[in-house]
């Protein structure tokens, strides 16, 4: 379990973890990923709280700084996945053509637009919803990855990461993490039900997106998982920002 947790931090953050102490990406690392979300979320929540103290409650600067810290802490891994996935979904042709677009390192117009919209929405939503919402939204994004890698979900052809993690998570593990984060979310919204509902709706949106990617690409890839993180984080933050 310790190696899996270390592997999760090495995989999903900039934290320097000696390779001998970290497991490679696989079932255990994916199962531990929501723990990384809770730690990242706590750090981002602290930045949001400090930002509201410095710039005033509801300041977009606080939300923008929070998003910037998350991007730095994750090496932009997930937002890059969102960009590549959006470009691939926006192209014509068979799955092979779409996957080739996804693997191309250049960002196309769809990808750039998706990144811009996501950063703006997260910045505004975080500033409005507050630090507790940041913690829940970031953790929920990582739960979405566990759900996306549940049993029965295939990997896209040629995807190295997809082959390692697709279908590795028992349904009960995904459900347990979803219940845990939804329970935590009762403390984040204006109303007790608002947080859990935001988390469930956000993860459901991610499930729909991943299902579409499976139909389009033949399975999941690492980029699809990154997109799942960003979609879930954004929708959760939006739900918690509702007054």
Curated annotation (Swiss-Prot):
Molecular function as annotated in GO: adenosylcobinamide-GDP ribazoletransferase activity; cobalamin 5'-phosphate synthase activity
EC number: 2.7.8.26
Main location: membrane
UniProt keyword terms in alphabetical order: Cell membrane, Cobalamin biosynthesis, Magnesium, Membrane, Transferase, Transmembrane, Transmembrane helix
Domain of life: Bacteria
Reaction catalyzed: alpha-ribazole + adenosylcob(III)inamide-GDP = adenosylcob(III)alamin + GMP + H(+); alpha-ribazole 5'-phosphate + adenosylcob(III)inamide-GDP = adenosylcob(III)alamin 5'-phosphate + GMP + H(+)
Required co-factors: Mg(2+)
Entry annotated with the keyword Magnesium: yes
Cellular compartments per GO CC: plasma membrane
InterPro entries for the chain: CobS
GO biological process, any: cobalamin biosynthetic process
Membrane topology: Multi-pass membrane protein
Pathway noted in the entry: Cofactor biosynthesis; adenosylcobalamin biosynthesis; adenosylcobalamin from cob(II)yrinate a,c-diamide: step 7/7
TM regions (residue ranges): 29-49, 54-74, 107-127, 129-149, 161-181, 192-212
Location(s) in or outside the cell: Cell membrane
Family indicated by similarity: Belongs to the CobS family.
Reported function: Joins adenosylcobinamide-GDP and alpha-ribazole to generate adenosylcobalamin (Ado-cobalamin). Also synthesizes adenosylcobalamin 5'-phosphate from adenosylcobinamide-GDP and alpha-ribazole 5'-phosphate.
This protein's name: Adenosylcobinamide-GDP ribazoletransferase
Organism (species): Mycolicibacterium gilvum (strain PYR-GCK)
Lineage: Bacteria, Bacillati, Actinomycetota, Actinomycetes, Mycobacteriales
């Amino acid at each position: 379990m310790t190696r899996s947790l270390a592997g999760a931090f090495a995989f999903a953050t900039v934290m320097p973890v000696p390779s001998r102490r970290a497991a490679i990406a696989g079932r255990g690392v994916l199962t531990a990923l929501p723990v990384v979300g809770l730690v990242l979320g706590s750090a981002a929540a602290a930045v949001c709280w400090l930002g509201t103290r410095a710039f005033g409650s509801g300041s977009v600067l606080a939300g923008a700084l929070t998003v910037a810290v998350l991007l730095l802490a994750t090496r932009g891994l997930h937002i890059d996945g969102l960009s590549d996935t959006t470009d691939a979904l926006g192209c014509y042709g068979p799955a092979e053509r779409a996957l080739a677009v996804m693997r191309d390192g250049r960002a196309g117009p769809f990808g750039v637009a998706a990144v811009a919209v996501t950063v703006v929405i997260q910045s505004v939503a975080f500033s409005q919803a507050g630090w507790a919402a940041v913690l829940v939204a970031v953790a929920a994004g990582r739960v979405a990855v566990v759900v996306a890698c549940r049993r029965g979900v295939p990997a896209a052809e040629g995807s190295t990461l997809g082959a390692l993690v697709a279908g590795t998570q028992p349904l009960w593990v995904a459900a347990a993490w979803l219940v845990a984060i939804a329970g935590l979310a009762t403390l984040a919204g204006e109303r007790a039900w608002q947080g859990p509902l935001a988390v469930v709706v956000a993860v459901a949106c991610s499930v729909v997106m991943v299902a579409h990617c499976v139909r389009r690409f033949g399975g999941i890839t690492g980029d699809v998982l990154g997109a799942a993180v960003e979609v879930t984080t954004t929708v959760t933050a939006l739900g918690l920002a509702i007054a």
